[in-house]
Amino acid sequence: MFKKFAIHFVIIVPMALLSLVLTGCNASTPTAESPTVAVPTAASQPAEQAAVMPRPGGPGGASTFASVAPTYTDLAYADQSAAQKLDLYIPTTGSGPFPVVIMVHGGGFMFGDKADGAGLTGVDQLLEAGYAVASINYRLSDEATYPAQIFDSKAAVRFLRANAAEYNLNPERFGAWGASAGGNLVALLGTTCGVAELEGAELGNADQSSCVQAVVDWFGPIDFLAMDEQFAGTSCPATHDAADSPESKLVGAPIQTVPELVATTNPMNYITADDAPFLIQNGTADCNIPPVQNQNLAEALSAVIGADNVTYSSLEGAGHGGSEFETAENLQMVIDFLNKYLQ
């Protein structure tokens, strides 16, 4: 059902703000040292994060999602659920066809909405840089269990590609940007191109590709079964294994009881050499998702698709979203990455 890779490529991860680890690496022999990682604690996590952002994701992550209204609201990309809608923002300058960034909100797979991003920001900056933006909703775990969420995400990509001419979009230049739960989904978009069992072709436009050409993963959960062990020995709560955790609710059972299904939520199990380039970011003080989750994803991708196609940065002192991700400098880093592959 899925492919596994033994990861031997190891990257030293300095914790300076926005340190670029994988971009520009040369082909020298990898070091045998382990990645340097700052261990997050509940005390180091911003108080407001613990108060308003349940694992993994939640409302309030981004102060401003967009200052402009969508050009098109509630476009239905499938017809099985009222949740299967997207908002589309089109730049007001430029002639197009425009490259597209699909934004996938966070919220622990339990809540969040396309109108607020739930952990995302940057619509204004994307529009100014000449990108169309499609912010999607998907079925949440109280309505449908996994793989409905990745089915919906892929259906949205196929819908946009099928209707690219109508909306003046470039069907060959699609990126995906997600935060927290959305980070997991965009990482799957970037690694499961052509994986039939995760396609959900019955949702429509089956003749279209659901592949994306660039991925921005903000602090997404990657390996559900490893999270509590990775938090062991820290003051961060280790509750992902609980029967009522967001991850267990996503798959419809305690995660330890359905390891084969849980394995299909892990992007690292699908990495191949033709995967999309990735920008991966997390905070060093994230007490919701262990920072090593995204470090491991970056290393696994780098070993297979090449270090030049993977950029990893760790934001010193940042938690699970928040203002550190929203700075002009960091948003420009995202735009620069997307420009490299989509413009």
Where are the model-predicted features located?
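N-terminal cap/lid segment of alpha/beta-hydrolase-fold proteins
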Residues: 53-96
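Mobile cap/lid helix-loop segments that gate and shape the active-site cleft of serine hydrolases
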Residues: 61-67, 191, 195, 226-270
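Short beta-strand element of the alpha/beta-hydrolase
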Residues: 97-108
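Short amphipathic alpha-helix adjacent to the substrate-entry channel of hydrolases
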Residues: 115-134
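Alpha/beta-hydrolase active-site loop
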Residues: 144-165, 332
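Primarily recognizes the serine-hydrolase "nucleophile elbow" in alpha/beta-hydrolase
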Residues: 155-232
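Short beta-strand/loop motif that positions the catalytic acidic residue
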Residues: 274, 279-282, 286
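Conserved alpha/beta-hydrolase "acid-adjacent" motif
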Residues: 287-296
